[in-house]
Amino acid sequence: MSFVPSKVFFTKGVGRHKEYLSSFELALRDAKIEKCNLVTVSSIFPPKCERVSVEEGVKMLTPGQITFAVMARNSTNEYNRLIAASIGVAIPADDTQYGYLSEHHPFGEDAEQSGEYAEDLAATMLATTLGIEFDPNKDWDEREGIYKMSGKIINSYNITQSAEGENGMWTTVISCAVLLP
């Protein structure tokens, strides 16, 4: 049996609780995907896959459903510890080709830093498969321009959740690309 997703939605959440597992559950609830049995998968954006809104995607879910997702996840119980979870996305101009999703889950990076890093990872992985020449030592903004000017990468973006740890609590952040039939 072959399953190639035709739709994807992106979601994120944060949860806080005195128990680690409960903080993860609350992050899933915040992301609106707590009712699924999530199976994490690696980082390929399927060809011809359509992005739908969170609201539309959640309507396609059934409680208990086995649901495939690319997930970035991070947790802390340290007061004021900055955490983030980011999914980077890079989509080729040719929709018959696959793109890339990347996961990044750092400590000490805010949402902008973490998101840009994840987006850079995904775009760089895609660029290398498409034969786009670039200098990996250039900063992301310069490489992003090169990637998009090549005409081979049409879009890149990220979805990121960040938070700071609270005293006496576990804090969990997640960002997910949820893959649908």
From Swiss-Prot:
Key words, A-Z: Decarboxylase, Lyase, Pyruvate
Origin superkingdom: Bacteria
Record carries keyword Phosphoprotein: no
UniProt site positions, description: Cleavage (non-hydrolytic): S42, S43
Free-text remark on how the cofactor is bound: Binds 1 pyruvoyl group covalently per subunit.
Swiss-Prot/TrEMBL catalytic activity: L-arginine + H(+) = agmatine + CO2
Cofactor(s), names only, from the UniProt record: pyruvate
Pyruvic acid (Ser) modifications at: S43
InterPro entries for this protein: Pyr-dep_his/arg-deCO2ase, Pyr-dep_his/arg-deCO2ase_sand, Pyruvoyl-dep_arg_deCO2ase
UniProt-listed Pfam families: PvlArgDC (PF01862)
EC code(s) of this entry: 4.1.1.19
Record GO biological process: arginine catabolic process
MF terms (GO), sorted A to Z: arginine decarboxylase activity
Family: Belongs to the PdaD family.
Database matches in NCBIfam families: pyruvoyl-dependent arginine decarboxylase
Official protein name in the record: Probable pyruvoyl-dependent arginine decarboxylase
Organism the protein comes from: Chlorobium luteolum (strain DSM 273 / BCRC 81028 / 2530) (Pelodictyon luteolum)
Organism placement in taxonomy: Bacteria, Pseudomonadati, Chlorobiota, Chlorobiia, Chlorobiales
Gene this chain is encoded by: pdaD
